[in-house]
UniProtKB/Swiss-Prot annotation:
Primary localization class, coarse: endoplasmic reticulum
Topology, Cytoplasmic side: 1-4
Glycosyltransferase keyword on record: yes
GO biological process terms on file: neuron migration; protein O-linked glycosylation; protein O-linked mannosylation
Transmembrane annotation, as ranges: 5-25
Organism for this UniProt entry: Rattus norvegicus
Entry membrane topology: Single-pass type II membrane protein
EC category: transferase
Protein name as annotated: Protein O-linked-mannose beta-1,4-N-acetylglucosaminyltransferase 2
Similarity comment: Belongs to the glycosyltransferase 61 family.
Subcellular location: Endoplasmic reticulum membrane
UniProt catalytic activity: 3-O-(alpha-D-mannosyl)-L-threonyl-[protein] + UDP-N-acetyl-alpha-D-glucosamine = 3-O-(N-acetyl-beta-D-glucosaminyl-(1->4)-alpha-D-mannosyl)-L-threonyl-[protein] + UDP + H(+)
Length: 580
């Protein structure tokens, strides 16, 4: 009896402890859901979107974090997480190791050489790296109560949200296509920006990409001390970027550009629809030239004269627009129907991606600034399929520039430099190639005001624009490539001890019958087996007999491919092995 009483007492104690823990867990869950709801209320309430807190907590504590990435290096990697957590106190992401944890790639210490991935699209920038700390899932017992984020998250950094070029090139375009890289993400994801900036001047543009309000790092503190994402994608695709800013070598086009005008225009179509901007005809009722007017620096000092001369030269209306005085939707509406866009070098020129096909971009450069050294907008305008004409004009007359050496250094001032360096900069005729981002000579020159020499500008434009500028109706500009030639065959014959013939034939690529192609040619490579060199032939027919330099009793390797319009090279068919 005594032992039975003791056992019953212990059992009651255990049951009481279990019930107490269950009640506390339910209270815990209710409290956290209320906190999350309150935290989200001012941002973007999501009716009906809740998470089963006890189940989520159990999955995290038992299973841990799960990660699978695409990409071979940190510069091209995007990772998909389940149950990735973030400590607002430590400002670090956490990977909890549990029974079901997966970490692919499992890099060990190589994860810190230098990072798991880039959070922004600016490649290998040491302020944009992403990594996490590791903990056993059991550590959750000693940590703040986790708040589970029910949304699918896309976690990234904005590079410079106050600069329109950076907003489009580094953020919006990559975000747009990253959201479409994974099924359903564009409709479900909430954007989480972790770089630490405030909203910035163009935050409304980021809101267009997702039906859910983006969140900044500073806003996460209102949700809880420890946040856990049930489902998160981390990183951005860099495939749409075309320019590097000069952190390692002087700025210029990327070495391997993978985007075309087609992808740019798909993006701009989406943006104009979200901005409620119509492409149906010019908003002013006629064709016009659009001039970007700057109001604070890099001014065009004879802007009125420039407008008049452009109107007279091209017999078209001229209109000014500025980022300061127009809404961005109005800017897009004007740009997307303009025949020509004229602007000083600057971030506003990224709006050229909204220009219609056949329009002209005219970029003006201040004194001593070489257009060949600063080409983000030239590179954009000349992407395959953008179908824009590009003109660069440079002020070559020192007297036509107004400098501002007294301004702060970040606005081109040079009075903080020693007198010898100031004198050198003032006498310089061209800014040397340099790295980003604080070169005083570059800043001094790029923030100059300019009186445009009208005759030299018109001469520069006329070298490119032969007739009346403006959009033109064009055929589908996408270049379609041939497939492999089919049924390639070879036949050899020997004529005597020193002569031989090699006949090669093939059928057209099967996709050719569905295409309208101006010119079709075939390239044939002949290589004697064992030799390192080959002889190329360009042919118009689907068969040919080779006699020159064909040897008897010799084996030849033969490759054949189709070429459209002299530049669209198809793949080689499988190699033919032909013996004479």
């Amino acid at each position: 009896m005594h032992l039975s009483a003791v056992f019953n007492a212990l059992l009651v104690s255990v049951l009481a402890a279990v019930l107490w823990k269950h009640v506390r867990l339910r209270e815990h869950a209710a409290t956290l859901e209320e906190e999350l709801a309150l935290g989200q209320q001012s941002l973007d309430p999501v009716p009906g979107l809740r998470i089963d807190y006890p189940k989520a907590l159990q999955i995290l504590m038992e299973g841990g974090t799960h990660m699978v990435c695409t990409g071979r290096t940190h510069t091209d990697r995007i990772c998909r997480f389940k149950w990735l957590c973030y400590s607002n106190e430590a400002e670090e992401f956490i990977f909890f190791h549990g029974n079901s944890s997966v970490m692919l790639p499992n890099l060990g210490s190589r994860r810190f050489q230098p990072a798991l991935l880039d959070l922004s699209t600016v490649e290998d920038h040491n302020a944009q790296y992403f990594n996490f700390v590791e903990l056993p899932a059991a550590a959750l017992r000693f940590m703040p109560k986790p708040v589970f984020v029910p949304d699918v998250a896309l976690i990234a950094n904005r590079f410079n949200p106050d600069n329109l070029m950076h907003v489009f090139h580094d953020d919006l375009l990559p975000l747009f296509y990253t959201l479409r890289q994974f099924p359903g993400l564009a409709q479900e994801a909430r954007l989480f920006f972790m770089e630490g900036w405030g909203e910035g001047a163009h935050f409304d543009l980021y809101k267009l990409l997702s039906p859910k309000q983006p969140l900044l790092r500073s806003q996460l503190k209102t949700l809880g001390r420890l946040l856990c994402f049930s489902h998160a994608f981390v990183g951005l695709s860099k495939v749409t970027t075309w320019y590097q800013y000069g952190f390692v070598q002087p700025q210029g086009p990327k070495a391997n550009i993978l985007v075309s005008g087609n992808e740019i225009r798909q993006f701009t179509r989406f943006m104009t629809e979200r901005l409620n901007v119509s492409h149906a005809g010019a908003p002013l009722g006629e064709e016009y030239i659009l001039v970007f007017s700057r109001t604070q620096n890099r001014l065009i000092l004879n802007e009125a004269e420039l407008l008049l001369e452009l109107a007279q030269e091209f017999q078209m209306k001229t209109v000014t627009v500025s980022l300061e005085d127009h809404t961005f939707a109005d800017v897009v509406r004007l740009v997307s129907n303009a025949s020509m866009l004229v602007s000083m070098h600057g971030a506003q020129l990224v709006t050229a991606l909204f220009l219609p096909r056949g329009a002209t971009v005219v970029e003006l450069f201040p004194y001593a600034v070489n257009p060949d050294h600063y080409t983000p907008y030239k590179t954009l305008a000349t992407l395959p399929g953008m179908d824009l004409q590009y003109v660069a004009w440079r002020n070559m007359i020192r007297e036509n520039t107004v400098t501002h050496p007294e301004r702060p250094w970040d606005q081109g001032g040079i009075t903080h430099l020693d007198r010898a360096e100031q004198a050198r900069i003032l006498q310089s005729r061209e800014v040397p190639r340099h790295l980003c981002c604080r070169n005083p000579e570059w800043l001094f020159r790029i923030y100059q005001d300019t009186r445009v020499d009208i005759p030299s500008l018109m001469q520069s434009i006329r070298r490119v624009v032969k007739g009346r500028p403006g959009p033109r109706r064009q055929r589908w500009a996408i270049s379609l490539y041939p497939g492999k030639v089919r049924e390639a065959r070879c036949q050899a014959s020997v004529q005597g001890a020193t002569e031989a013939r090699l006949s090669v034939s093939w059928q057209i690529p099967w996709n050719l019958k569905y295409l309208k192609v101006r010119e079709v040619r075939y390239e044939v490579w002949l290589q004697e087996q064992g030799e390192n060199t080959y002889v190329p032939y360009m042919l118009t027919l689907q068969n040919h007999t080779f006699t020159e330099n064909i040897k008897p009793f010799t084996t030849y390797l033969v490759w054949v491919r189709c070429i459209f319009n002299r530049s669209l090279l198809g793949p080689f068919a499988d190699v033919l092995v032909c013996s004479t």
